[in-house]
Regions:
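Short helix-to-coil transition segments within interhelical loops
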Residues: 2-10
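Alpha-helical transmembrane segments and their short interhelical loops
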Residues: 10-11, 15-69
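Internal alpha-helical transmembrane segments of multi-pass membrane proteins, especially GPCRs
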Residues: 14-19, 48, 73-79, 115, ...
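Residue-level recognition of pore/gate-forming positions within transmembrane alpha-helices
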Residues: 21, 53-54, 79-83, 126-130
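Hydrophobic alpha-helical transmembrane segments of multipass membrane transporters and ion channels
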Residues: 23-31, 80, 120, 124
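Transmembrane helix segments
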Residues: 59-108
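Terminal transmembrane helical anchor/hairpin motif
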Residues: 87-139
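Short cytosolic juxtamembrane segments of multi-pass membrane proteins
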Residues: 140-144
Length: 144
């Protein structure tokens, strides 16, 4: 509630707390993946993975922002928001069609993209993440 009366306002708060760190993280992850990678991914694939990971980090941050009422709840939700990334291991562990039970998790499609290098797997990641961000942003707005 106090955010609305600060000079930044709600949008300024989100920009300062989400957008700036997200842009910095995208650049750093791209640089690190480019120079420290042992997988031999192309620069284009590395760029895409950096962007998708950044989008997933926004989803995780929005979970905390939308539902945490205080610092203790925020710390607990930080643990829960890590479940956004659990989809990354599913296609590597479960190789038959049962893996698609987890297709509602955006990170599942990032792993599918990494395995197959099929650019169509980027779209479900973007649409699912965008939908989650939209829902969580509306929850955040209703909370304030």
């Amino acid at each position: 509630r106090y955010i609305t009366i600060t000079p930044l306002g709600k949008k300024g708060y989100l920009i300062s707390r989400l957008l700036i760190p997200v842009l910095f993280a995208a650049i750093v992850s791209f640089v690190l993946l480019s120079f420290c990678s042992v997988s031999g991914m192309s620069l284009w694939t590395t760029f895409i993975i950096s962007i998708l990971a950044t989008i997933l980090s926004v989803v995780a941050a929005m979970i905390i922002l939308a539902y945490a009422g205080n610092k203790v709840e925020g710390m607990a939700l930080a643990k829960v928001s890590a479940l956004v990334m659990v989809g990354l291991i599913i296609p590597f562990v479960i190789t038959d069609s049962i893996q698609y039970v987890f297709s509602f998790i955006p990170s599942f499609w990032v792993a599918k993209f990494l395995i197959s290098n099929n650019y169509w797997f980027i779209l479900p990641t973007i649409f699912l993440s965008g939908g989650l961000i939209y829902l969580l942003y509306n929850r955040y707005n209703a909370k304030i």
